Swiss-Prot record:
Its biological purpose: Tyrosine-protein kinase that acts as a cell-surface receptor for fibroblast growth factors and plays an essential role in the regulation of embryonic development, cell proliferation, differentiation and migration. Required for normal mesoderm patterning and normal skeletogenesis. Phosphorylates PLCG1, FRS2, GAB1 and SHB. Ligand binding leads to the activation of several signaling cascades. Activation of PLCG1 leads to the production of the cellular signaling molecules diacylglycerol and inositol-1,4,5-trisphosphate.
Ranges that cross the membrane: 375-395
Annotated active site: D621
Residue positions with a glycan: N76, N116, N225, N238, N262, N294, N315, N328
Signal peptide range: 1-21
GO molecular function, one term: fibroblast growth factor receptor activity
Cellular localization per UniProt: Cell membrane; Nucleus; Cytoplasm, Cytosol; Cytoplasmic vesicle
Record key words, sorted: ATP-binding, Cell membrane, Cytoplasm, Cytoplasmic vesicle, Disulfide bond, Glycoprotein, Immunoglobulin domain, Kinase, Membrane, Nucleotide-binding, Nucleus, Phosphoprotein, Receptor, Repeat, Signal, Transferase, Transmembrane, Transmembrane helix, Tyrosine-protein kinase, Ubl conjugation
Designated name of the protein: Fibroblast growth factor receptor 1
C-alpha cells in the first residue's frame, strides 16, 4: 500500500508529465545574448570557508580567475579547481572583487563576485549591512589609495532619518557609514556626553566594520540624542540621531474594518477571505464557520455553534492565518464565517457572509479557447492531488479510536498543545472576554438543556497525555486539605514512583485541583499554570512541577510540598516571646532566627526570581505570602505560573488573608498597569521589608487613597529596626521611581551572597523590644491607632552612621521621608 507521500509524489509527476506534453517555447537565435555579465555578493567572517562557483557553458575551453585585476594565486589556503575557488580560514585581506573569465566558441563570459570578509563578529542585527561592503564602496575607497582624505559619509542617504521612535524592548541600531584616509575612528556620545557601555543596563555593541551601534531591549531611560563622531588627523565629522522609546500599550487584537468582506460566488468557485490583524502581544488567529446543531444555530447558553476551519500550527505564520481559502465551494459552504483573534489581553472578531449561486453555462468560445488545454492539465493535476488528500483523510479517520458525537473532531489551541474535545464546541462571541491564559476558550455543548457555566463534569475535557509528566491515578493517595480558594483547592498527598528509577518510593506532594463549582476559566487557568511550569523548568528556589493526572478523571497538578507554610507565617511564628504583636505572646517560638537566617531568606528568594527572570517570567505578585518554606528551610517561590487579569484588579479589595495587593505593587504597575521585571524588583524590596520586620504588614494603617498620593510624591517606608544601612539602601534602590534605575535580580543575588558570606551565624536578633511601628500579624483591625502619628512607617530622620543591630530604634513622630 502506497504511503500518502508516495501518492502525492505520483500526482505531481503526472501533472508535470501532462505539462511537458505542450511544445516548449523557443527564442530566435538573435535573441540569445552574446555575452553575459553577472555580479554576486558574498559576505563571510574570519575563519569561514569561502566558496565561489562559476557557472559554465558546455563548450567552455578555458577558465581564468583574478582578484582585483590580478591573477589569483593558489596557496595552502586557496584552492582552484576549474570552475570553483575555495578559500579556507578566510581573513579580511581576502576581501575584493573576484572575476571568473571563460572562453568558448560561442563567446566569452565574465562573472564577478564581490567578497567582503568582515572583522566584526557575526550578528543577526547585521543582516541589512551587506550593501555597506559593496563593490561600489570599495571602488570609491580605491580611487585615492595614497592620498590624505578627511572623513566623509559614504551613504548619507541612509542617515536622513534622524528621529527614531520605537516601542520598549525593541533593538535599536544607529549607523554612520564613513570613509577616509587614514581610516578614521568612531566614538559615540549620548546627550553630548561620552557614552560608555556601563551607562545603560545591558550595555551596547559597536560594529566598527559597519560604523554602527546596537542597543538591545531599549527602555524609556534610553531616550535622548546619540551622536557619532568620525575623525582622523585630517578632520572630523559628526551626525546626531534622536531616539524616543514609546511604552507598549497592551490591548486586544485590532482587526481592520471591512475585513473579511462578504462574498457572492458561483457554485464550484474558489473563495478567499482576508482578515488583517494588528496586535502587540503575539496573536492567536482562528477561522470559524457558524453551523447548525439539531436545527439550531444558538446553543442553550445563547452562544453560537461554530466549527473551527483553520487554526495556527507550530510552523504557521500570522500572514498565513490571515487568509482563509475555500476551494470548489458548494451550497453547503454558504453561511457566516468569522475571523477570531486573541492575545493575552482579550479577543476580537469580525464576520462575513458567503453566498453561493447556481453556476452559469460555459459558452462555446470558452471551450475553444487556446487556454483550454492548459486548464484541463492543471485541473487534472488538482483533481488527482485532491483525491490523494481525501484518501489520506479517510485513512486517518478510520485509524483513530476516539468516538465523536458529530462528523468532525475539533481542537483548542492550548500553549502549542491541542486539547481535543469529545463534543461539538461553541466559542464565546464576546470580544472583550479575557484571554490571560493565552488560549482560546472553548466549551463543550451540553447534552442537557441547562445553561449553567459551571464545570459539573470536568471529565468531559480530554487533555492530551504528556508521558514526561503523567502519573497514574492509582499511584496518588490524596490526604488532608492544605488550603482552598473560591474555585480551587490544594491537598496533601503521597505519590508513589515519581522517580522512574525508584518506582516504589513514596513522596509527600501537594496536589492542585478544581472544586466542583469551578468554571471553564478556572480550568483554563489551572491548565495554563501547569503548562507554564513545564516550560519554565526546575530550580531549587521555586515550587517545581512533579507530575500531573490528566486522564480518566479530574485534572490534578502535582507540585512540591512545603511543610512550613508561607514565608510570612513562618517569620511571624518565630518572633521572640516578648515581641509585641506576635500571634500568641505566651508560647515559645519554634526556633530562634539569626540575622544571617533572614539574609539567607532574602538571598534564596532573589535566586529564584533571578531564574524566573532568565526564563522571561514576570511574577506580578511577589510577596512573602507567595513564598513557601520547606522542611529544610528552603525558600520556594510559588504562584509564578498563575494567569492574572491585570486589567480588572480591585485596588480596594483585600486578599483572603487581609493583605492589600497594591502595597506590593510598583507605581508603574499601580497607575499604568505596566508589569516588568523591574516592577517585580520593587515587590522584592517590599518583601525584604517583610523579612526584616518578621512578617510585618507594609504601610500599616495607611488608606489606599493616601498610599497613592504618598507614592506619587516619592515617599518610602522607613528602615526596619533590625536591618543594616546597607540592606535598607538595597530596599530603597528597589523602590527607585525610575524602573530602569532599580537593580536587577542578578545584582541583588550578588550583593546578598556577599552579605551572607560576611555575616556571622551567631548574630541573633534582639527583638524583645516593642516594634510598635509595625502591624500585627493578623488582618488590620487597628485602623484608629495605626493611622496615628505614633504609628507611622514613614520618617525623615537621617540614617544612622552605624548598623542598627542590635539596638532599640527611636519612635518616629509622623514625619515623612521623601525619596
Amino acid at each position: 500500500m502506497f504511503t500518502w507521500r508516495c501518492l502525492i509524489l505520483w500526482a505531481v509527476l503526472v501533472t508535470a508529465t501532462l505539462s511537458a506534453a505542450r511544445p516548449a517555447p523557443t527564442l530566435p537565435d538573435q535573441a540569445l545574448p552574446k555575452a553575459n555579465i553577472e555580479v554576486e555578493s558574498h559576505s563571510a567572517h574570519p575563519g569561514d570557508l569561502l566558496q565561489l562557483r562559476c557557472r559554465l557553458r558546455d563548450d567552455v575551453q578555458s577558465i581564468n580567475w583574478v582578484r582585483d585585476g590580478v591573477q589569483l594565486p593558489e596557496n595552502n589556503r586557496t584552492r582552484i579547481t576549474g570552475e570553483e575557488v575555495e578559500v579556507r580560514d578566510a581573513v579580511p585581506e581576502d576581501s575584493g572583487l573576484y572575476a571568473c573569465m571563460t572562453n568558448s566558441p560561442s563567446g566569452s563570459e565574465t562573472t564577478y563576485f564581490s567578497v567582503n570578509v568582515s572583522d566584526a563578529l557575526p550578528s543577526a542585527e547585521d543582516d541589512d549591512d551587506e550593501d555597506d561592503s559593496s563593490s561600489e564602496e570599495k571602488e570609491a575607497d580605491n580611487t585615492k589609495p595614497n592620498q590624505a582624505v578627511a572623513p566623509y559619509w559614504t551613504y548619507p542617504e541612509k542617515m536622513e532619518k534622524k528621529l527614531h521612535a520605537v516601542p520598549a524592548a525593541k533593538t535599536v541600531k544607529f549607523k554612520c557609514p564613513s570613509g577616509g584616509t587614514p581610516n578614521p575612528t568612531l566614538r559615540w556620545l549620548k546627550n553630548g556626553k561620552e557614552f560608555k557601555p556601563d551607562h545603560r543596563i545591558g550595555g551596547y555593541k559597536v560594529r566598527y566594520a559597519t560604523w554602527s551601534i546596537i542597543m538591545d531591549s531599549v527602555v524609556p531611560s534610553d531616550k535622548g540624542n546619540y551622536t557619532c563622531i568620525v575623525e582622523n588627523k585630517y578632520g572630523s565629522i559628526n551626525h546626531t540621531y534622536q531616539l524616543d522609546v514609546v511604552e507598549r500599550s497592551p490591548h486586544r487584537p485590532i482587526l481592520q474594518a471591512g475585513l473579511p468582506a462578504n462574498k457572492t460566488v458561483a457554485l464550484g468557485s474558489n473563495v478567499e477571505f482576508v482578515c488583517k490583524v494588528y496586535s502587540d502581544p503575539q496573536p492567536h488567529i482562528q477561522w470559524l464557520k457558524h453551523i447548525e446543531v439539531n436545527g439550531s444555530k444558538i446553543g442553550p447558553d445563547n452562544l453560537p455553534y461554530v466549527q473551527i476551519l483553520k487554526t495556527a500550527g507550530v510552523n504557521t505564520t500570522d500572514k498565513e492565518m490571515e487568509v482563509l481559502h475555500l476551494r470548489n465551494v458548494s451550497f453547503e459552504d454558504a453561511g457566516e464565517y468569522t475571523c477570531l483573534a486573541g492575545n493575552s489581553i482579550g479577543i476580537s472578531h469580525h464576520s462575513a457572509w458567503l453566498t453561493v449561486l447556481e453556476a452559469t453555462e460555459q459558452s462555446p468560445a470558452m471551450m475553444t479557447s487556446p487556454l483550454y488545454l492548459e486548464i484541463i492539465i492543471y485541473c487534472t493535476g488538482a483533481f488527482l492531488i485532491s483525491c490523494m488528500v481525501v484518501t489520506v483523510i479517510i485513512y486517518k479517520m478510520k485509524s483513530t479510536t476516539k468516538k465523536t458525537d458529530f462528523n468532525s473532531q475539533l481542537a483548542v489551541h492550548k500553549l502549542a498543545k491541542s486539547i481535543p474535545l469529545r463534543r461539538q464546541v461553541t466559542v464565546s462571541a464576546d470580544s472583550s472576554s479575557s484571554m490571560n491564559s493565552g488560549v482560546m476558550l472553548v466549551r463543550p455543548s451540553r447534552l442537557s438543556s441547562s445553561g449553567t457555566p459551571m464545570l459539573a463534569g470536568v471529565s468531559e475535557y480530554e487533555l492530551p497525555e504528556d508521558p514526561r509528566w503523567e502519573l497514574p491515578r492509582d499511584r496518588l493517595i490524596l490526604g488532608k486539605p492544605l488550603g482552598e480558594g473560591c474555585f480551587g483547592q490544594v491537598v496533601l498527598a503521597e505519590a508513589i514512583g515519581l522517580d522512574k528509577d525508584k518506582p516504589n518510593r513514596v513522596t509527600k506532594v501537594a496536589v492542585k485541583m478544581l472544586k466542583s463549582d469551578a468554571t471553564e476559566k478556572d480550568l483554563s487557568d489551572l491548565i495554563s499554570e501547569m503548562e507554564m511550569m513545564k516550560m519554565i523548568g526546575k530550580h531549587k528556589n521555586i515550587i517545581n512541577l512533579l507530575g500531573a493526572c490528566t486522564q480518566d478523571g479530574p485534572l490534578y497538578v502535582i507540585v512540591e510540598y512545603a511543610s512550613k507554610g508561607n514565608l510570612r507565617e513562618y517569620l511571624q511564628a518565630r518572633r521572640p516571646p516578648g515581641m509585641e504583636y506576635c500571634y500568641n505572646p505566651t508560647r515559645i517560638p519554634e526556633e530562634q532566627l539569626s540575622f544571617k537566617d533572614l539574609v539567607s531568606c532574602a538571598y534564596q528568594v532573589a535566586r529564584g526570581m533571578e531564574y524566573l527572570a532568565s526564563k522571561k517570567c514576570i511574577h506580578r505578585d511577589l510577596a512573602a505570602r507567595n513564598v513557601l518554606v520547606t522542611e529544610d528551610n528552603v525558600m520556594k517561590i510559588a504562584d509564578f505560573g498563575l494567569a492574572r487579569d491585570i486589567h480588572h484588579i480591585d485596588y480596594y479589595k483585600k486578599t483572603t488573608n487581609g493583605r492589600l495587593p497594591v502595597k506590593w505593587m510598583a507605581p508603574e504597575a499601580l497607575f499604568d498597569r505596566i508589569y516588568t521585571h523591574q516592577s517585580d524588583v520593587w515587590s522584592f524590596g517590599v518583601l525584604l521589608w517583610e523579612i526584616f520586620t518578621l512578617g510585618g504588614s507594609p504601610y500599616p494603617g495607611v488608606p489606599v487613597e493616601e498610599l497613592f498620593k504618598l507614592l506619587k510624591e516619592g515617599h518610602r517606608m522607613d528602615k526596619p529596626s533590625n536591618c543594616t544601612n546597607e540592606l535598607y539602601m538595597m530596599m530603597r534602590d528597589c523602590w527607585h521611581a525610575v524602573p530602569s534605575q532599580r537593580p536587577t535580580f542578578k545584582q541583588l543575588v550578588e550583593d546578598l551572597d556577599r552579605i551572607v558570606a560576611m555575616t556571622s551565624n551567631q548574630e541573633y536578633l534582639d527583638l524583645s523590644v516593642p516594634l510598635d511601628q509595625y502591624s500585627p500579624g493578623f488582618p488590620a483591625t487597628r485602623s484608629s491607632t495605626c493611622s496615628s502619628g505614633e504609628d507611622s512607617v514613614f520618617s525623615h530622620d537621617p540614617l544612622p552612621d552605624e548598623p542598627c543591630l542590635p539596638r532599640c530604634p527611636p519612635h518616629s513622630h509622623g514625619a515623612l521621608k521623601r525619596h
